[in-house]
Amino acid sequence: MEGIRIIMNSECRSWAAGDPIMEKYHDEEWCKINHDDRFEFEMLCLEGASVGLSWKTILHKRAAYCMAFHYFDIDKCAAMKDEELNGLMEDTGLIRNRSKIYSVRTNAQAVQRIQQEYGSFDKYLWSFTDGKQIDGRWKSLSEVPTVSDVSKALSKDMKKRGMKFVGPVITYSFLQSIGIVNDHLVDCEFR
């Protein structure tokens, strides 16, 4: 039928299957290279918010996070005052965890320093892989790691720079979310 796209339900897509928001994320964003500092900062913040929770929970709250945090404009987030951050504790659209909310400002300020040092957040991030995407080319989801030497090194460096909620596992998910790591299975049509 014209205009209808048939999507194969490979094992790769199984973690997103049945939820339109998760499917859209899998198909259009996950493991897709994106060199935009704002987008990379958004993913860093959303991944940090997901600590101890499911990614599905955070994706379903993404619009509220965008509204609350100035669409992740780095400079605006870095300049947020305590009163504004405290007010977000009342926003039912967010995970109302003070440390996670305040981490957005802390991480934005760290990203600003990185931008001054490297020219962009993107250049800093890609410096950990010499500008090359890590393509796992896995055959099964059971092969996909949750941490790597790169995520450990990046996590360590981001922590040294004062960032919060950037452990090596979350950092690995972050690397997937911005396309530095491509963990779509080899048979996934969204590689």
Question: How would you name each of these model-derived features?
Answer:
Residues 2-191:
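HhH-family (HhH-GPD) DNA N-glycosylase catalytic core used in base-excision repair
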